């Protein structure tokens, strides 16, 4: 089956130009100023931009969180991505019971029958021991080339600095990229306990108990650990201008340090958490200031931040209202869980449908 896209403006990484594009199966076979193909379905793209399908390198599909689960599965989530022009998503495998290989197999079983587009996977490493150390080198053979560690979420997801160093060192030796969720888990725990004790329960306290300096410090720590492990590092969902500075510093000292930010950190601020519907805007790390937005934009302009992803992780604002899913009415608890306590608000925003 051939498809001929005519009269469009083709956009590549380097330039944009008027041309026709001929596709056969899943491959582009010709780009030229004018193409004729009698056996092709013709799509007239006059006045339209023709872009490659997007890759969203950071999504969470069907993610359990606290008392609920995110509000899409691989069918609804991947369909939303396709409508937005994204044709590949990269989700995360949770490190649950069993081996890493078993966790990966379970994730594929969840995704393969429902995904409407291409997908790939990162592997979370939230528990480290000798068996995990032995398994890490095998991940590329299982199609996994990136792993993620956390410096926050104490007693749940966080690894200690020594464990992160060991993980990075193994990763660097075996062609794996280490992604880091960079916040200071100890400071968050102290400030959260104090806020609740003082009766602070509204959504804005999600940001106030996760100070921006925590992300800056944890990002520098991640870069420093990567330098000592002689391994590449990728800071996910950067939200602080100061994090951009840490990448610049690391690269100036020959550390292969990369970074990602997301639309929510470029267009919204912590002021949105003060709105009546502030729970909608709760994500981790939290939204920051307009000055941080400016710093992130500069990071994009200079190439310090190389990746724009979404950290897609949607929850219903009011999960008490049932929806029709696979022929049945179901209710999935959502942001209303935290109406009296900001720590119970599911952390996450939608985004995979936007590009």
Feature names for model-found ranges:
Residues 1-4, 9-52:
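Histidine-rich, glycine-flanked metal-binding segment
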Residues 46-114, 131:
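Metal-associated gating/positioning segment near the N- to mid-region
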Residues 86-88, 117, 145, 306:
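Short acidic/polar active-site loop segments enriched in Thr and Asp
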Residues 89-91, 120-123, 232-237:
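Short catalytic-loop micro-motif centered on adjacent basic/acidic residues
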Residues 101-117, 165-180:
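Alpha-helix-loop-beta-strand connector modules within alpha/beta enzyme cores
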Residues 134-308:
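Histidine/acidic residue-rich metal-binding segments in metalloenzymes
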Residues 201-230, 301-302, 307-308, 313-355:
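His/Asp/Glu-enriched, well-ordered alpha-helical/loop segment
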């Amino acid at each position: 089956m051939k498809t001929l896209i005519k009269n469009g403006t083709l956009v590549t990484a380097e330039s944009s130009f008027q041309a026709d594009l001929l596709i056969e199966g899943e491959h582009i076979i010709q780009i030229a100023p004018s193409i004729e193909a009698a056996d092709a379905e013709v799509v007239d793209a006059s006045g339209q931009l023709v872009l490659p399908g997007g890759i969203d390198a950071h999504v969470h599909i069907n993610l359990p969180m606290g008392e609920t689960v995110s509000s899409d599965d691989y069918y609804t989530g991947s369909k939303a991505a396709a409508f937005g022009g994204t044709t590949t998503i990269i989700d995360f495998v949770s490190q649950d019971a069993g081996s890493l290989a078993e966790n990966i197999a379970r994730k594929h079983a969840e995704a393969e029958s429902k995904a409407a587009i291409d997908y790939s996977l990162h592997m979370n490493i939230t528990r480290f021991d000798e068996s995990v150390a032995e398994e890490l080198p095998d991940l590329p053979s299982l199609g996994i080339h990136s792993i993620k560690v956390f410096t926050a979420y104490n007693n749940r997801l966080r690894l200690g600095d020594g464990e992160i160093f060991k993980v990075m060192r193994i990763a660097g030796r075996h062609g794996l990229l280490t992604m880091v969720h960079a916040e200071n888990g100890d400071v968050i725990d102290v400030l959260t306990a104090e806020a609740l004790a003082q009766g602070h329960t509204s959504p804005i306290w999600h940001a106030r108990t996760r100070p921006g300096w925590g992300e800056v410090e944890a990002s520098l720590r991640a870069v420093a650990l990567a330098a000592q492990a002689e391994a590449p590092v990728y800071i996910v969902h950067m939200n602080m201008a100061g994090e951009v500075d840490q990448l610049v510093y690391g690269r100036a000292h020959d550390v292969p340090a990369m970074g990602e930010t997301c639309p929510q950190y470029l267009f919204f601020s912590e002021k949105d958490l003060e709105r009546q519907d502030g729970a909608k805007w709760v994500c981790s790390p939290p939204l920051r200031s307009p000055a941080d937005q400016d710093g992130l934009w500069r990071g994009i302009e200079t190439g310090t931040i190389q990746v724009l992803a979404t950290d897609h992780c949607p929850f219903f604002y009011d999960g008490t209202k049932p929806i029709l899913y696979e022929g049945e009415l179901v209710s999935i608890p959502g942001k209303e869980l935290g109406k009296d306590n900001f720590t119970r608000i599911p952390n996450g925003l939608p985004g995979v449908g936007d590009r």
